[in-house]
Amino acid sequence: MPARPARALDLLLAWDGSAAPDRPEPLIFAAWREAVLAMAFAGAGVAEAARPAGTAEFLAFLLHPDDRGAWWCGGDCAALAGRALDRAVDGLAATQGADPAAWRWDALHVARFEHPLLRFIPILGPLTRLEAPTGGDGETVNRGGYRDGGPGG
């Protein structure tokens, strides 16, 4: 395994599951989860526009030890998970830099506050938008969105 994905994997394996804003692990996990789900849906022939939002339940189904999700993964979900980590880490390196330990969840996970109409007016839009970096994720009470398309994009 190349050094960068290996370092990211080490971080994930030592992670306590906290989605703290200053940590790289939730960012790596979110990008990996998106990559696993995208690759599984693509491999099963599900058109991108028809793909449901990824859920923790479907990810658990794919990665269950009894291989119940193998059809979605081309027969080997562990291999797909490894390829997804490579893809996720490459994508993050392009936007966050080369060192996975220096990445931060709050670089892409923000609470955004903006006026529903004024945001479309060129001069007023930026003046009526506030963003605050935040921790948490879609599976916690501290829910927030992604900046610029998410951790994988």
Predicted feature locations:
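Acidic, low-complexity N-terminal propeptides/linkers enriched in Ser/Thr/Asp/Gly that mediate export
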Residues: 1-153
